[in-house]
């Protein structure tokens, strides 16, 4: 039989190195490995050498076990414990160190006990010398009560070790009611124990048996019970070493043998039957102990309460005495008392207010260390005189604390502080000090006013009318989404770059707790609006805006009405510009149509169209549903207070279902006239012209109801529909005249641009001399591209126009500075936390202002938490050299929408490495920028498990390390994979595969159910049964 070295070291309580060294000395070669196996012969040699270490370990374990049992079972021991103590030493293991320690203190004589008290019959035997030896044994437990606990602990231990003793224990427990059986359990162990003291014990117990029947009724004192029990315990513990004399340490125990014998004789002379065990108090349960604790706590609380009431009464008495001073105290004594009282108050206040300062307290001593350290009385340096009062006075001092708390109020503190300050400032009361004080007060007041003013101004927004939603959000330091949500809650659909009017700005700002102040008021007042006399007003043509979802047939309808093909000229077959057309019907009446884009990017254009229009035609395709842009167009029209006419298009298609559209409109609370509502609707086919004339009739009917009038004989005012930069003609603006007549040669002021009208064209590009109310026109001669949606006015002189535009430019610059987003510390922290934060700077150039606005709006919307899109510049016209240099300086890309770079700009871009992207369709521009943003995102690493391998055998190969012989359970393991070692479901190691072999050949991969040899880089902990999981890391492209 072989035994592992690990087990041997545990059994013999020695280290592996010690065992290996010893065996080598004896001529055995053994590896210093815990799993090394040794023969029985080697084991016998080790046992012979290290048996003492083994015994020591067993002893210590036994001692620890006894101590733990002692703590668990704290019960008193009667004779049963005494008997068990005798029998317990049967175990061969001798407690060498512990027994002498227990025995020594127990023989120290402390006092004497008169044993004659127990019974008269035993006096004959007890009168001899043994009495003296009993005294120390009996008295000692009284001093060291834990002895009783020790004996109790040994009771369960003996039960577990010696099974034969269990019946004896049961009989011994019945000692009090039936004492007769006590003799049997004591007699039984006698043959097993050879020592003489045990025989003496037997005699003693026999005597007890004889005496018991006569003295059962007597009830001696409890103290005597305890003494007798404890003597029994002591003798039991002392006899233990006598039974273990077979061990090597006989010498130690021989000295004590005669003493032990004498003590045993003495115990035999005590009448144990006279002790009534039933009088011993029972061990209290946890519940009883808890009740006792609660009762004590209750008593303590009651005492505390009574003490508190007494203190309060005392305080009140003192207060009443102070409040009613005697009549006799009008002399100097009364004054002195009063002064003392005030001083006392001051001291109390200071104690409360400055309790943390270095004022000396009673029983504290200040030293080099600084601070007050409480010291016990009489233990200061030198231990000098203690100037402490007697206990009575100390109690008084202790009771004064609540007095302070009750007397001191905030008013008293304030009064005290005031008096102190007044006392401090009275020094040197001359004119200069008064003057300085007044000056300081004035300065502090001024500072306070400035602070208040700044606080008030921080909540006031200084802005020009028509700031965009994005700029407003920046000024209020809130998210633009919140501003848009607020606008939607009041029934307005706005986009990020849509300019808001004054009324909307006021509402939104008030919602966020800001006040508005329009700094352009003086500029607005510079242009005086003329009131028209009713007799000057003449009927004008209605302005009708066609709105709806993309591809629902808006432009097709206008093409039919105008007998033109606009769609063919639009890139991608979708409208990307707002168009204004004046159409004359067969009966001679005129209608001005505005065609708006349906794509979601053109929200601002639709809003602008709804703002300047009189009537809105909402087109819905009969073979489709009411789409999001349709709903948005309806909301824009409703917000502008414009009458709506629904045109249900494409009714000629086989899949058309006009009733379904009417049902969806009814669900949105727009009930058509056919269904008993107030909104007119017409089924049409824009391609074939079905129902178009009826639609015109209904539109003109709405116009008649509105009674539209204007004064053509005055200076023109109106709106900028679109503006662009034409290569041959310069800046061109499409305008819609709302009042007056615009003529060639008029000085037009629009936003920050102005100029003399050099030429005018209608929508068919035919030159015209003038444009009346509700007529669109294309004007040339402006010095810049005005923003779409701006109003234009005709002014008298060029100088007036220049002054107003200069002021507006200044305001625009100020507004730009105010709305410029500064990188805050919070934003910087957010970017650092993200780790891979990116910024994409874009310069947008387009052919018309509306398209530039729509495109930049859509690009800003693409911003995410990880990538922020910044449109650092946007403008109308071709891509110039200045755009390229700006892009090179700010690492931006240039997006051109239906514009091309000039030759010089293209060459410069090539040199500087600036990326210029040119688009004709807004969809393409948005999609490509989105793809570029996704490319900026760092790819995600994902793990894909390729195989699981089970280790069947582990080989330790020199210079290679551990190699596992394994079987591929699932999948296919590749040489390039990474691997993790798993043991009992826990990952032990993760790393790369060092080698993958099959029959001594290196292989690239091993399939399922094939065996292979595998080793991992720097892995030296493999065991049979471990699992190896192989995986590969795949880069996954992130999406927005």
Curated annotation (Swiss-Prot):
Subcellular location: Cytoplasm
Listed CDD domains: IF2_eIF5B, IF2_mtIF2_II, mtIF2_IVc
Composition bias, Basic and acidic residues: 81-92, 222-232, 285-335
Classification via SUPFAM superfamilies: Initiation factor IF2/eIF5b, domain 3, P-loop containing nucleoside triphosphate hydrolases, Translation proteins
GO biological process, one term: translational initiation
Low complexity bias locations: 233-244
Region (G2): 573-577
InterPro entries from the UniProt entry: EF-G-like_DII (IPR053905), IF2_II (IPR044145), IF2_N (IPR006847), P-loop_NTPase (IPR027417), Small_GTP-bd (IPR005225), T_Tr_GTP-bd_dom (IPR000795), TF_IF2_bacterial-like (IPR000178), TIF_IF2 (IPR015760)
Region listing for G5, in residue ranges: 685-687
One Gene Ontology MF term: GTP binding
Comp. bias regions, Basic residues: 427-437
GO CC terms in record: cytoplasm
Region of interest: G1: 548-555
Biased composition (Polar residues): 351-366
Residue numbers spanned by region Disordered: 67-92, 214-251, 272-402, 427-451
Region (G3): 595-598
Region (G4): 649-652
PANTHER family, alphabetized: TR-TYPE G DOMAIN-CONTAINING PROTEIN, TRANSLATION INITIATION FACTOR IF-2-RELATED
Stated role: One of the essential components for the initiation of protein synthesis. Protects formylmethionyl-tRNA from spontaneous hydrolysis and promotes its binding to the 30S ribosomal subunits. Also involved in the hydrolysis of GTP during the formation of the 70S ribosomal complex.
Sequence similarity: Belongs to the TRAFAC class translation factor GTPase superfamily. Classic translation factor GTPase family. IF-2 subfamily.
Name of the protein in its database record: Translation initiation factor IF-2
Organism encoding this protein: Bacteroides thetaiotaomicron (strain ATCC 29148 / DSM 2079 / JCM 5827 / CCUG 10774 / NCTC 10582 / VPI-5482 / E50)
